[in-house]
Curated annotation (Swiss-Prot):
Subunit organization: Forms a heterodimer with timeless (TIM); the complex then translocates into the nucleus.
Amino acid composition bias (Polar residues), ranges on this chain: 345-354
GO biological process: circadian regulation of gene expression; entrainment of circadian clock by photoperiod; negative regulation of transcription by RNA polymerase II
GO cellular component: cytoplasm; nucleus
Location of region: Disordered: 318-354
Protein name: Period circadian protein
Function per UniProt: Involved in the generation of biological rhythms. The biological cycle depends on the rhythmic formation and nuclear localization of the tim-per complex. Light induces the degradation of tim, which promotes elimination of per. Nuclear activity of the heterodimer coordinatively regulates per and tim transcription negative feedback loop. Behaves as a negative element in circadian transcriptional loop. Does not appear to bind DNA, suggesting indirect transcriptional inhibition.
GO molecular function: transcription cis-regulatory region binding; transcription corepressor binding
Location(s) in or outside the cell: Nucleus
Positions of the PAS domain: 1-55, 133-235
CDD domains: PAS
Organism from which the protein derives: Manduca sexta (Tobacco hawkmoth)
PTM annotation, UniProt: Phosphorylated with a circadian rhythmicity.
Amino acid sequence: GIVMYTTSSLTTTLGFPKDMWIGRSFIDFVHPRDRNTFASQITSGLAVPKIVNGQSPGNPASTMVCRIRRYRGLTTGFGVKDRVVTFMPFLLKFTFKNVSDEEGKVIYLVIQATQFFSAFRIPSEVVSKAVPFVMRHAANGNLEYIDPESVPYLGYLPQDVTDKDALQLYHPEDLDYLQQVYETIVKEGGVPRTKAYRMMAQNGDYLKLETEWSSFINPWSKRLDFVIGKHHIIEGPSNPDVFQSPDPEKAVAMSEEEKAKEQKYRRDIIRTMNEVLTKPAEVAKQQMTKRCQDLASFMESLMEEQQPKVDEDLRLDIQDPDHSYYQRDSVMLGGISPHHDYNDSKSSTGTPLS
């Protein structure tokens, strides 16, 4: 889509001269890695069924996290240093509007961009009121969902880490403890809250957090489908700017023995999630067995209640053969759904543009 209008905050935030975006395509200013996600978001918005005046029911807005290019002449602000082109993270809110002109009604896309800032200001900042965020990964470790609330704390954009190995984010020295945590999750269905452990931010440094764990056990396969973690940040990383690129000079050199040990821990966690017989699975099995037994008992009692009435009908038919007869068919349909509704927290964060 071609940009038709911008607010003055575009200049103060990204440094572009006034009206420089007018007549150009918005996607030209989007980071190349975010363009597919951006295009998909726009396409899905246009595909929503419209009602009167071309508005979606309630005119709902969709959101996504996206990096937008800064003006090359801008010399201040955070971002990746020593690069010709730098980008800044934003939460984009999309709404579609109908505007009537001399050519008729035209649908315009209105984008409200809210800049993300790092949640930390000083190295290893102790955090007391961090906004919790949710991550969900499958039994094979693949990250399936991450909250937008995580962006100021971890620095990752959701599309950068989705379908990646969530276990790679854990500090190698904490994998031993986390293996015990996962064993408890599988056996008990969850963990109320863990001890503090470390997770890697986008800049390569680690922050400390505590997590409330839960899981979903498929009642049909009796296997763990996914694990949900509600994370509470308690201490920031040594580099407070989580949006910076990792410093290769700070990378810790590991011996081959340490690497092998780290890989073994991760394999053991995956095996735990896929092989250990779980208490929740047994509970689900018992619940399903009880439902079947209850259904069978109900059907038996129903048939017993209907039996005297059927006999009376038969006697009436014998006494008065001229009366037409009828049948009573009793049908009961029962269904047990293996699906469990889980609502991912949807919210936005950041400071609105001024």
